[in-house]
Design a protein with these regions (language model features):
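Hydrophobic cores of alpha-helical transmembrane segments in multi-pass integral membrane proteins
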Residues: 1-14, 28-51, 62-89, 97-147, ...
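Membrane-interfacial, low-structure loops and terminal tails that flank and connect transmembrane helices
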Residues: 19, 189-195
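Inter-helical turn/loop segments and adjacent helix faces that build the functional surface
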Residues: 15-21
Length: 196
């Protein structure tokens, strides 16, 4: 995984450095999805050392990888749909404060989701591992109560992060519907390929 990730990142950085247009609107979200994918790939490489770090295979750390990969796919899809869906109706998105808030909401919620689940995975893994080494399993009984007191706050934070993600999705829906109904009209020349 290291060699493909390095090749991908080098090509991506060269492409970003050589672009002539500033990253505006949905292109900025697409760039963030690439960064999220890269971070998730690094987490995937770390989790492959399961024999060195046994806590990584049984905790929420595995969910970080899933959330990161799905998140990068969702953000890339949202970024492309901001261009494609209004174009199907002959419109385009006029980027405003609503789109900025939507993009910021998606970015911060996925970033917080990754950070919180990483902390949750490491905390629960070490406490479960410590309990097992001490001879008191933490899957049930008093040991479970101790572990739950360590990780319950993170699960509550996950709920609020999910609500932030839901709110960002609702703002995305409003933004796309607004672009379809009252966005700038795209001319036919922009939509049709010409041989000139």
């Amino acid at each position: 995984l290291v060699v493909p990730l390095l090749a991908f990142l080098v090509n991506y950085i060269k492409t970003v450095q050589s672009k002539e247009v500033d990253a505006e609107g949905s292109l900025n979200l697409l760039n963030f999805s690439v960064i999220l994918f890269s971070i998730t790939t690094i987490f995937h490489m770390i989790s492959s050392f399961e024999n060195l770090l046994p806590i990584l295979g049984i905790t929420n750390f595995v969910n970080v990888i899933t959330y990161g990969l799905i998140g990068s796919l969702v953000l890339a899809t949202i970024s492309l749909s901001y261009y494609l869906i209004p174009k199907l109706y002959g419109r385009e998105v006029n980027y405003s404060r609503l789109e900025d808030i939507t993009f910021f909401g998606f970015k911060i919620s996925y970033l917080l989701l990754l950070i919180n689940n990483t902390v949750l995975g490491v905390n629960s893994g070490y406490s479960w591992n410590a309990g097992a080494n001490a001879g008191s399993p933490t899957i049930y009984g008093e040991g479970y109560g101790i572990v739950w007191s360590l990780i319950s706050f993170n699960f509550s934070v996950n709920t609020f992060i999910s609500l932030l993600l839901l709110g960002s999705g609702f703002l995305y829906l409003i933004s796309v519907l607004r672009a379809i109904s009252s966005g700038s009209i795209t001319t036919v020349e922009e939509m049709v390929y010409s041989n000139d």
